[in-house]
Amino acid sequence: MKYDFTAIEKKWQEKWLEEKPFTAVTGDKTREKFYGLIEFPYPSGQGLHVGHARPFTAMDIICRKKRMQGYNVLFPIGFDAFGLPTENYAIKNHVHPAIVTKQNIANFTKQLHMLGYSFDWDRVVDTTDPSYYKWTQWIFLQLFKKGLAYKASMPVNWCTSCKCVLANEEVVEGVCERCGSEVIRKEKSQWMLAITKYADRLIDDLDDVDYIERVKIQQRNWIGRSEGTEVDFTATNGDKLTVYTTRCDTLFGVTYMVISPEHPYLAQWKDQLTNWDAVEAYRQEAARKSDFERGELNKEKTGVRLEGIEAVHPVTGKHIPIFVSDYVLMGYGTGIVMGVPGHDQRDWDFADKFGLPIVEVVKGGDVTKCAFALKDDTGIMVNSDFLNGLTVKEAIPVMKKWVTEHGIGRPKTNFKLRDWVFSRQRYWGEPIPLVKCEKCGWVPLPEDQLPLLLPEVKSYELTDDGESPLSKMTDWVNTTCPKCGGPAQRETDTMPQWAGSCWYFLRYMDPHNDKALASKEALEYWSPVDWYNGGMEHTTLHLLYSRFWHKFLYDIGAVPTKEPYAKRTSHGMILGEGGEKMSKSRGNVVNPNDIVAQYGADTMRLYIMFVGDFEQAATWSTDAVKGSKRFLDKVWNLAETAADSEDLTPANEAILHKTIKKVTDDIDTLKMNTAIAAMMTAVNEMTANGVTKGDMGILLRLLNPFAPHITEELWEQLDFAAKTGKMCCQAEWPVYDASKTVASSVEMAIQVNGKMKGTVTVAVDSDEETVKAAALSVDKVQKATEGMQIVKTILVKNRLINLIVKPR
């Protein structure tokens, strides 16, 4: 019978949909729960690609094995469907984003079924569904009520093409992460979320979770906690100039100060600066640059010296110049920095450009040529008055104590992390459920009025003034204040795409609840997510944002755990043939539909796991796909030769138990490629030995998570389904028995006077007399010893026997 993968895969996909063997049962106390999570996809028009298939298949394998091991498994799927690409498509093609989204979700769903994933299809969520975003809005209202959502006027990242504000995390090397267009700085009033209030906990609680180390490192670096000192300099006009430094030991080396172009002092000093026109021109130029461009270490240093105001050094009392320069960002620290050119290369470059003094305060380098930035803290202080002779490590606490006692400084913990720019001037996002009342200010909608629905608009075109398309909907915008009943206007900004993905894993636990985001019972039963796999590119975006929201929900008693995910792993990218990143422009994008049509879903799944180390990038090879198909053909053909016995073939028992251990361990450690290699080796050996149905029963269960369709079909054909009343995916996972990996018999070489005469099979660890008797029963040995006397027997246990003979 031919292996007809098309018919087989269709048959089992329909059967799984009908019989629902992958349904998760909330509250089942008879089984241990396991919650496996993948990052739900954005349903683009291009459909599912191999970049989705790799992590989805891996988690499907993990969850299928867990079910077979007796766990109550929650493995859900949904769609992160708000966002810019759909809105841009709608603008270009004059079609409502909701229609585009519905079509794309239907296509994705078809593809996910096609690949045989064991999702619980009764728990699908869609972030654009009002019954879902009702609770996204509810969470925002709780943040607002607790003072963690606030509006602030600030310089923001403005995409010149998307015409919307971007979070810092969405700007990559000075361009928009989404469209690649130039990002400039623009002053705008924005809704902000105070993620910085959770900065310490977001770092400290990483110690309590099982995340791969590179994820922890990236999050710690992004949050950027540093212990330092705030020091107060004074301007000659009396204003206080506070700086933050981690190296207060270098205070005697300060020869100038730099202020950010956005600092409010500059506008206040307008009439005191004799070169205001030059300062203002520089400020305007800086506003056109992104934070990335301004912060590049290698860029040429620019700036304007303030004429009319200087700074007074707090320790020496000397007057030092103040410059405005764009490398100082208002969003980090205080927006003012002290220049220590002797020991910071950027400061040295600046001082060199503007002819400023360079003072050595840590001995060891030649500061006339470049900064001496010692990497450790053993350098010796010089030119530093009462710090002279101390090491850097000794000098820091001495200076910190000195500035504190003199009332000009204080210890300070600082973070690189900025509050989250939350609002977007777009249409296709969750409406923000607030109104602005002249009398009451910003007022939240009553919770019984949620969801605030996204209204129909005539055009999704962006306004040139940077306002949302919703701002043109005057009938919708104008409303009444829920607090005083007076006239009010709705907020017309919408939430970013990240909003819906901050809590989707909670909704999976109870997706149809209209009274709460999820019931207390469901949250307590399923929390936390046991294993979350996702892309490294989301480490400082979605992963950080969702941890923040979850901690907030924990604080208000809405969820039972401090952390959302117990374990986080990541995967490498699939590259196109030749090792280049897949892209439409290169014409090297692999469509899973094509592979499935030609080779089958099981082959696709098997290959995408066999292609290389899961955590590393791997190069796609269509030729290599054929190898995975040949392996499945071998399994199919082997099953057709199986003897009608449920006993294991003695020659296969050890092979199978070694394979059970290898596959079980490798799935748990994401070594899917070596698990498959072990099964390939086992199939080759079993083909040589011959198999029984009993042998195949173990092999099919091990292979089922990887290739579920073919294994279900063979399980049924070999009568296991009829005998057990279970599909293969419901059968028990094979249990490893170490004693079975030790062979019961061994083949030993037979020598007569050192010359090879044949082999004999005996029980393992047989004694000399047993082996000798068995050897003498072999024809060639009998002929070689005929008429001879055995004078000595040499036995190498389990390997050989050598009979030393002489004529009688």
Segments from the language model and where they lie:
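Residue patterns forming the tRNA-binding/recognition surfaces of aminoacyl-tRNA synthetases
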Residues: 2, 15-19, 92-249, 336-456, ...
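NTP-handling and nucleic-acid-processing catalytic cores
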Residues: 3-13, 50, 136-363, 467-469, ...
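Helix-rich, typically C-terminal accessory recognition domains appended to large enzymatic cores
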Residues: 80, 145-159, 411-440, 497, ...
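N-terminal catalytic cores of NTP/NDP-binding nucleotidyl/phosphoryl-transfer enzymes
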Residues: 25-95, 124-139, 245-246, 313-350, ...
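Secondary-structure transition/capping motifs at alpha-helix termini
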Residues: 64-72, 92-98, 110, 114-118, ...
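Alpha-helical recognition segments enriched in aromatics with Gly/Pro capping
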Residues: 309-332, 361, 477-616
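Conserved oxyanion/phosphate-binding beta-strand-loop segments in alpha/beta enzyme cores
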Residues: 1-37, 67-76, 100-107, 280-324, ...
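Glycine- and acidic
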Residues: 39-48, 120-125, 329-337, 381-385, ...
